[in-house]
């Protein structure tokens, strides 16, 4: 079996295709967005490979696995078990970190449990149990002839007169003791003060160091250890200031007796009570009510709403503030910013133990007076948040919560014991906070000796291999402690790719979805090397990809097309790259051979130095106090290697600031910055990302772009509708009236099958048409509402040609290249690139003010060369209306057509975070330090 044979694949828009795919090769599936690549790779090959594997398990085991639908295909032969690595499923678990996903943290736990050296947190002394012979050897290694004495500590820093203890020691035959640092005779001990802390150490032996002492010393040490319960001290008799030797036979600190249980891997897990920090339960952050969120606008007064919910309109809380104002003599009508720091403290944190006279008035106007301390706004919110059972109250209060690093563990997630175990003077949190590249250097140079080297050998190999795979997929800038929630789709996918290589499976079919997303051209070669490595192990690697380098590196290319949606679903060309380039119908072939290409603009829009948006002092994550200057009215690209700080600068700093100031949103805090100027040039900010346009099957392009409302109004205006008294609501499948009630307007009915995937069957009342019979009797230009929803955008544009409002909105959907999707197509079936273009179309169809700031993060994800051309046309159109466009992008075709480029770098992670160069593409291409410049220069020729 050296090939996979597919016969009669009809999944989604595939048109009954037959294919022969070579096994154990690197196969790239390419084609326009929406042409059917994912339908072939994921919904046919992967789904069937996965289903066959799961079918072999028992019915009991199957119910725990999410089964995929059986693809609509006649026959597939030669499949192996399949593993898919997609972008979608990043973990939302706050306990997941890069270290735990890649299993590096598990190996680190093992390493620290087996070769770690525990130390006392207070005295930094290694906790090591010593044998008597080790103690004797240590003493004998001192200079010969040195006068020493051996002491047994009996009492450490305890109050009391201790007369009984001293009498007992004398009766046991001991002659001297050192009491509070002074050696004295036990026959006449000093009188000790009752209220002072004392330390008593018995003198067991006094000697001069010489070689034949070992027998006598061994006996003395045994006596001392028995008397003191495991500790002994050796002091210099001639020099009181000399450092004393401390010995312990217990696994404990010889100074304070701090001891630890035996080291085991779970002690180093922040997901296990044994190792988690008790304050934050191993999350590394604490939630708190943030005064900056509670006081949204310090220029307002308390009466005017400085604290939401405590102003004049909320009678109960406001009368408390008035009583407080009387007591502390401040004015509730004065702006919050003008009140003293003490008043701020009392209002937010309470009056402590000080009683305040509160006047309460009830609904009938009766006043009662009570005296009690004021708990403070923040404490009041915290208490209500903990006590309430209403989810609405909790959601309302959650808006005022921020996270800060846990004070006890300083964000390391581990308890005190785990933080004080060292491998070569480095504790576990220090390794977790290293970037992956730095950690790799650390383990390469780690030299353990003797038995510890043997124990750690295998563990270190596993850690080293996994770090190397992460570096090879371009993730050397991530830290192991980075939370999985904060990873981008491309990063999460490449981490899973690295863990798969770490698993070293053979004979598997891997299906990957655009692994090059979010990856700079520089890191692309390493990623392709990784894919080739997977193939060389003996696996079939199928990649859905548009990247030119990936297509050139493939053993076998499958080009799906010729168009998208209903116009696609056929194999236009397949075989090695030369064969693809020889097929004139293949768009991919034409772009690869250079017959078609995305042109560099003849002239660029010049920047106006008077109109700029200037953000100064951005310091989030790895940004090094940068100043970003964006020309207004231009198409700007933000570039730089992965992890250089592009998303932090734009998505975490610029976008939240603009959203708060322009859109009045009360969303997440922007990353730290000093100042922003130039926002007055804009009236709103819009982020166009690839998140789904709706999460339910009821959401569709028609409802999202606002086409559906005028369509329903047209149907309601038909004479037949008016005579029946139908309103536009009659033609909605979301409300009662016109929809089919058997399936509630879904058109399908979900049947839950245990052990098998849920099946959706067409509703037998409306036959999948979503409306009842009466509604479907109304026709507009000979079509029912169901038939209109079933039209593609192209057909609908022609059909509604005479209705300008509709024609304009549909035209914008065509402008962004979505000719093939259906008006009523469920939002859940759209790809990320399609969802993004539906959003773009909605923006284009609005009557623009020409003062919008658009932010796009990697809009070329999932787009073919021809789709990118269309996207660029749309973005240039938005720019020509006067809008400002900021795009984070790695795709050189987009970068070379930009008016302005801001390049961050030079490296990722701690090696990045600076703006290297900003200017036109021609200026940037000349920058020596920039990695982007190196790849951009040849494109501009």
UniProtKB/Swiss-Prot annotation:
Lineage: Bacteria, Pseudomonadati, Pseudomonadota, Gammaproteobacteria, Enterobacterales
Organism: Salmonella typhimurium (strain LT2 / SGSC1412 / ATCC 700720)
Protein family (similarity comment): Belongs to the ABC transporter superfamily. UvrA family.
Binding site for ATP: 31-38, 640-647
Cellular location(s): Cytoplasm
ZnF C4-type: positions: 253-280, 740-766
Top-level taxon in the UniProt lineage: Bacteria
Quaternary assembly: Forms a heterotetramer with UvrB during the search for lesions.
UniProt key word Transferase: no
Function comment: The UvrABC repair system catalyzes the recognition and processing of DNA lesions. UvrA is an ATPase and a DNA-binding protein. A damage recognition complex composed of 2 UvrA and 2 UvrB subunits scans DNA for abnormalities. When the presence of a lesion has been verified by UvrB, the UvrA molecules dissociate.
GO CC terms of this entry: cytoplasm; excinuclease repair complex
GO biological process, one term: nucleotide-excision repair
Protein name as it appears in the record: UvrABC system protein A
Domain ABC transporter: 310-587, 607-937
Note: Binds about 2 zinc atoms/molecule.
PROSITE patterns: ABC_TRANSPORTER_1 (PS00211), ABC_TRANSPORTER_2 (PS50893)
Pfam families: ABC_tran, UvrA_DNA-bind, UvrA_inter
Entry annotated with the keyword Transcription regulation: no
Keywords: ATP-binding, Cytoplasm, DNA damage, DNA excision, DNA repair, DNA-binding, Excision nuclease, Metal-binding, Nucleotide-binding, Repeat, SOS response, Zinc, Zinc-finger
GO molecular function: ATP binding; ATP hydrolysis activity; DNA binding; excinuclease ABC activity; zinc ion binding
């Amino acid at each position: 079996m050296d090939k996979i044979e597919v016969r009669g694949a009809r999944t989604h828009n595939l048109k009954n295709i037959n294919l022969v795919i070579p096994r154990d090769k690197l196969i790239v599936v390419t084609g326009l967005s929406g042409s059917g690549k994912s339908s072939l790779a994921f919904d046919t090959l992967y789904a069937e490979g996965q289903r066959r594997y799961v079918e072999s398990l028992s019915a009991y085991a199957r119910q725990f696995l999410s089964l995929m639908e059986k693809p609509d295909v006649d026959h597939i032969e030669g499949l192996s078990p399949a593993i898919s690595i997609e972008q979608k499923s990043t973990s939302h678990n706050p306990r997941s970190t890069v270290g735990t996903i890649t299993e590096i943290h598990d190996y680190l736990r093992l390493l620290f449990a087996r070769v770690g050296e525990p130390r006392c947190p207070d005295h930094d002394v290694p906790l090591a149990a010593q044998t008597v012979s080790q103690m004797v050897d240590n003493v004998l290694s001192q200079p010969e002839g040195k006068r020493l004495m051996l002491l047994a500590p009996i009492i450490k820093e305890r109050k009391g007169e201790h007369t009984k203890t001293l009498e007992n020691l004398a009766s046991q035959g001991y002659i001297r003791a050192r009491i509070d640092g002074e050696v004295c005779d036990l026959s006449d001990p000093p009188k000790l003060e009752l209220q002072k802390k004392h330390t008593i150490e018995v003198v067991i032996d006094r000697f001069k160091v010489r070689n034949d002492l070992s027998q006598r010393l061994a006996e003395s040490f045994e006596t001392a250890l028995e008397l003191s319960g495991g500790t002994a001290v050796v002091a210099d008799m001639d020099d009181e200031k000399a450092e004393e030797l401390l010995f312990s036979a217990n696994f404990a600190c010889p100074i304070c007796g701090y001891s630890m249980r035996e080291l085991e891997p779970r002690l180093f897990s922040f997901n296990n009570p044994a190792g988690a920090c008790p304050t934050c339960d191993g999350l590394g952050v604490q939630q708190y009510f943030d005064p900056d969120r509670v006081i949204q606008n310090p220029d307002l007064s308390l009466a005017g709403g400085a604290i939401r919910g405590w102003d004049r309109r909320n009678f109960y809380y406001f009368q408390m503030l008035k009583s407080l104002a009387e007591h502390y003599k401040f004015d509730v009508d004065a702006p919050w910013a003008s009140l003293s720091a003490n008043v701020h403290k009392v209002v937010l944190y309470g009056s402590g133990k000080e009683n305040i006279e509160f006047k309460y008035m009830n609904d009938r106007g009766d006043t009662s007076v009570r005296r009690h301390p004021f708990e403070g706004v923040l404490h009041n919110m915290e208490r209500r948040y903990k006590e309430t059972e209403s989810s609405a109250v909790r959601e309302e209060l959650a808006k005022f919560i921020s996270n800060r690093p846990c004070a006890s563990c300083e964000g390391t997630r581990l308890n005190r014991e785990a933080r004080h175990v060292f491998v070569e003077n480095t504790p576990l949190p220090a390794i977790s906070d290293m970037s992956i590249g730095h950690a790799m250097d650390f383990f390469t140079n780690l030299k353990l000796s003797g038995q510890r080297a043997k124990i750690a050998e295998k563990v270190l190999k596993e850690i080293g291999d996994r770090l190397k795979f992460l570096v090879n997929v371009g993730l050397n800038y991530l830290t192991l402690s980075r939370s999985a929630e904060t990873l981008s789709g491309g990063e999460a996918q490449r981490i899973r790719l690295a863990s798969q290589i770490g698993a070293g499976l053979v004979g598997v079919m891997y299906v990957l979805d655009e692994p090059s997303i979010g990856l700079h051209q520089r890191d692309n070669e390493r990623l392709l090397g990784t894919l080739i490595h997977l193939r060389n192990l003996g696996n079939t690697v199928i990649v859905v990809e548009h990247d030119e380098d990936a297509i050139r590196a493939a053993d076998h290319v499958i080009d799906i097309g010729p168009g998208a949606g209903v116009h696609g679903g056929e194999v236009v060309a397949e075989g090695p790259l030369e064969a693809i380039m020889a097929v004139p119908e293949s768009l991919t072939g034409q772009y690869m051979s250079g017959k078609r290409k995305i042109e560099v603009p003849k002239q660029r829009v010049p920047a106006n130095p008077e109109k700029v948006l200037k953000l100064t002092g951005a310091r989030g994550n790895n940004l090094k106090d940068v100043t970003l200057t964006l020309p207004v009215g231009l198409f700007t690209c933000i570039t730089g290697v992965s992890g250089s700080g592009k998303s932090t600068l734009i998505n975490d700093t610029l976008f939240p600031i603009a959203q708060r100031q322009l859109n009045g949103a009360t969303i997440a805090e922007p990353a730290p910055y000093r100042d922003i100027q130039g926002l007055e040039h804009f009236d709103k900010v819009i982020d166009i990302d690839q998140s789904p346009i709706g999460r339910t099957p009821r959401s569709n392009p028609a409802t999202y772009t606002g086409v559906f409302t005028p369509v329903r109004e047209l149907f309601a205006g038909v004479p037949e509708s008016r005579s029946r008294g139908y309103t536009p609501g009659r033609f909605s499948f979301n409300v009662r009236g016109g929809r089919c009630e058997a399936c509630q307007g879904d058109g399908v009915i979900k049947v839950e099958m245990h052990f098998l995937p849920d099946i959706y069957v067409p509703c037998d009342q409306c036959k999948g048409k979503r409306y009842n019979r009466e509604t479907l009797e109304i026709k507009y230009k000979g079509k029912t509402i169901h038939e209109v929803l079933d039209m593609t955008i192209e057909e609908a544009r022609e059909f509604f040609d005479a209705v300008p409002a509709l024609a304009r909105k549909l035209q914008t959907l065509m402008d962004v290249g979505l000719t093939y999707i259906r008006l009523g197509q469920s939002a859940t079936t759209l790809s990320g690139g399609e969802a993004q273009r539906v959003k773009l179309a909605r923006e284009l169809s609005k009557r623009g003010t020409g003062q919008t700031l658009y932010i796009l993060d990697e809009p070329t994800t999932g787009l073919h060369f021809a789709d990118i051309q269309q996207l660029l046309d749309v973005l240039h159109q938005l720019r020509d209306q006067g809008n400002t466009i900021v795009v984070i992008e790695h795709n050189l075709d987009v970068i070379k057509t930009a008016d302005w480029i801001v390049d961050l770098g030079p490296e990722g992670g701690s090696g990045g975070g600076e703006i290297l160069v900003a200017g036109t593409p021609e200026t940037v291409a000349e920058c020596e330090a920039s990695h982007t410049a190196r790849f951009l220069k040849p494109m501009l020729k």
